[in-house]
């Protein structure tokens, strides 16, 4: 049994149930001004007042000024002494950890060292991995025992049985997936250039004007200057024959044209040579046939063997549309100094569809020219007879 000793110098303990009320301590004397404190000499008789803060060290780099401090000076009070070394059972105990939990040198981020965020993310990843493994282990259950014979292990299936077609047949699928072969996208992407005078379209194809559904008359630009109406008819016959052979399988309307006009330069034409203005007009019976000519010849070049020209064909919509409007316009036009009807606009009735391709120029009864032709006047050379002084 432990014996507790009492302190004989302790104050008596009051056992009364009544509360004891003691008089409050007297208030401290009012503070004395500094000038009065030093003038009366109280600083010499009594201890100087305590300094309002603790001074543990001083790093004064300025000179000392005596007029700023009283002659008696202030009492320098040092801070509390550092705690001594703690001993536990005669052995030096470890120092307590800092309040923040980690030493300052461990809170510093070194170059290349992981940050606090990296450490947290790695810990979360490890925890998630452990949870996933545990879930996989919990989800696995042994196969239930059946009353039938034990199942036998068979060899793995060969690679041929893993083919998509074989898998589809085993599953009873009616449609087997097969990679589609690259196909051409309709007639817009499948031009059929005529090999008579032109080559295949250049790559990339020049910008093409989109023809409207009502456009049947087109303007063929950048034609060789030596090309005549007969050459243009031969080119169109070959194109229509190719288009009709392709369209005959699908029941589409036939490609036919009923008017051709190659604008000639009458000042440069004579019996030895002919020269055009570089463009021609063609009217088709349907707008689809006009678009077919544009798809086939737009962006093509002329063959060097036929015409020594490097022009690129450009096909656009004409300003005047329709056969009737063209006949009225060309019928009122006068063509001065035109040597032959070959240079006039030609109207075909019935329309040409390429069935006579390769037969040469069309027969005269099938061609009707429109326009007023004025032949050139004969030139008479006047000679002067006599002596010239």
Swiss-Prot record:
GO terms for molecular function: RNA binding. Residues 170-211, 351-370 are annotated as: Disordered. The keyword Transmembrane helix does not apply. Residues 170-184 have a biased composition (Basic residues). GO terms for cellular component: ribonucleoprotein complex. It comes from the Eukaryota. Keywords: RNA-binding. Gene3D superfamilies: 3.30.70.330. Signal peptide: none annotated. InterPro entries: Mei2-like_Rrm_C (IPR007201), Nucleotide-bd_a/b_plait_sf (IPR012677), RBD_domain_sf (IPR035979), RRM_dom (IPR000504). The keyword RNA-binding applies. Residues 216-320 form the RRM domain. Probable RNA-binding protein that may play a role in growth regulation. This is Protein MEI2-like 7.
């Amino acid at each position: 049994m432990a014996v507790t000793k009492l302190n004989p110098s302790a104050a008596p303990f009051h056992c009364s149930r009544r509360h004891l009320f003691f008089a409050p301590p007297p208030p401290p004397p009012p503070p004395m001004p500094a000038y009065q404190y030093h003038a009366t000499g109280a600083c010499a008789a009594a201890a100087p007042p305590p300094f309002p803060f603790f001074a543990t060290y001083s790093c004064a780099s300025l000179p000392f000024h005596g007029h700023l401090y009283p002659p008696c000076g202030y009492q320098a009070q040092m801070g509390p002494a550092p705690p001594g070394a703690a001993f536990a059972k005669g052995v030096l105990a470890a120092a307590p950890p800092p309040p923040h939990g980690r030493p300052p040198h461990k809170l510093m981020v070194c170059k290349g060292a992981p940050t606090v965020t990296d450490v947290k993310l790695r810990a979360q990843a490890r925890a998630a991995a452990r949870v996933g493994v545990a879930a996989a282990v919990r989800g696995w259950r042994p196969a239930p025992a059946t009353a039938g014979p034990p199942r036998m292990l068979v060899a793995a299936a060969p690679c041929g049985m893993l083919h998509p077609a074989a898998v589809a047949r085993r599953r009873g699928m009616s449609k087997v997936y097969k990679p589609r072969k690259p196909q051409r996208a309709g007639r817009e992407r499948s031009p059929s250039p005529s090999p008579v005078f032109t080559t295949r379209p250049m790559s990339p194809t020049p910008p093409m004007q989109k023809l409207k559904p009502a456009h049947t008359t087109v303007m063929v630009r950048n034609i060789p200057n030596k090309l005549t109406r007969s050459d243009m008819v031969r080119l169109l016959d070959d194109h229509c024959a190719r288009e009709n052979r392709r369209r005959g399988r699908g029941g589409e309307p036939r490609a036919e044209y009923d008017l051709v006009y190659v604008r000639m330069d009458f000042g440069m034409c004579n019996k030895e040579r002919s020269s055009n203005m570089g463009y021609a007009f063609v009217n088709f019976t349907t707008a689809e046939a006009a678009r077919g000519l544009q798809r086939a010849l737009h962006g093509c070049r002329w063959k060097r063997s036929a015409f020594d020209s490097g022009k690129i064909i450009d096909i656009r919509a004409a300003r005047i549309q329709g056969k009737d409007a063209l006949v009225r316009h060309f019928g009122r036009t006068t063509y001065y100094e035109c040597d032959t009807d070959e240079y006039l606009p030609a109207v075909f009735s019935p329309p040409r569809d390429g069935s006579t391709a390769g037969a040469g120029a069309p027969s005269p009864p099938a061609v009707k020219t429109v326009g007023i032709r004025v032949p050139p006047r004969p030139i008479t050379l006047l000679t002067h007879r006599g002596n010239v002084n």
